[in-house]
A protein has these predicted regions:
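Mobile, glycine-rich extracellular loop/lid and propeptide segments
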Residues: 17, 45, 59-64, 92
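Structural recognition of alpha->loop->beta junctions
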Residues: 30-61
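Acidic/His-rich catalytic or pseudo-catalytic neighborhoods
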Residues: 1-33, 41, 69-174
């Protein structure tokens, strides 16, 4: 598909995939230390013209320069963890005249605004990460969309005739 996208005029190729890797390194370590998982064989089959892969599924946070694993595939591989606890800032600099990608960088930022409690207990602020003051304008914007989506989000889409458990199967999924 990449040749068709390039032929149609695409200058930058970004792949979104709901599959991820396991990462034993820091959330911003581009070396890809300890990266493993079922996404790797998929990545190794991607066209070398891919510039960025935004991944997920494993709920882990990472920014990986995939050229450290496979020099023939010099794209960035990113994931922002889970539940909005991390946001990935991605910067793709493209020459406006030629359309050539000049540089690509990504950085994961831990998002925390205030301590809270949930069913699992207290969730305190972590002093080693910056805390962001909640913005009323963004809360209002999110509230508008939450309200607009409420009917669809609460719509019954099926029923379950038996018990649903959170017991983990052989693959670790529940």
């Amino acid at each position: 598909m990449v040749p068709q996208l390039k032929a149609a005029g695409a200058d930058v190729i970004v792949v979104l995939v709901h599959e991820g890797v396991n990462n034993s390194g820091d959330i911003n370590n581009p070396k890809c230390d300890g990266v493993s998982g079922t996404l790797l064989p998929i990545l190794d089959r991607l066209d070398p013209a891919v510039d960025l892969v935004v991944s997920g599924h494993t709920h882990q946070s990472y920014v990986c320069d995939y050229a450290n694993i496979n020099p023939a595939r010099p794209f960035l591989l990113t994931s922002a963890g889970l539940r909005g606890q991390v946001v990935t800032g991605i910067d793709l600099k493209v020459d406006a005249r030629t359309g050539k990608l000049l540089s690509k960088t990504a950085r994961n930022v831990v998002v925390q605004s205030e301590a809270f409690s949930n069913a699992r207990g207290d969730v305190p602020l972590v002093e080693s990460f910056p805390a962001f003051t909640p913005r009323a304008d963004l809360a209002a914007l999110a509230g508008r969309y939450r309200e607009a989506a409420k009917a669809e989000a609460n719509r019954v889409v099926g029923t379950l005739a038996g018990p649903a458990t959170r017991d983990r199967g052989k693959t670790g999924e529940s």
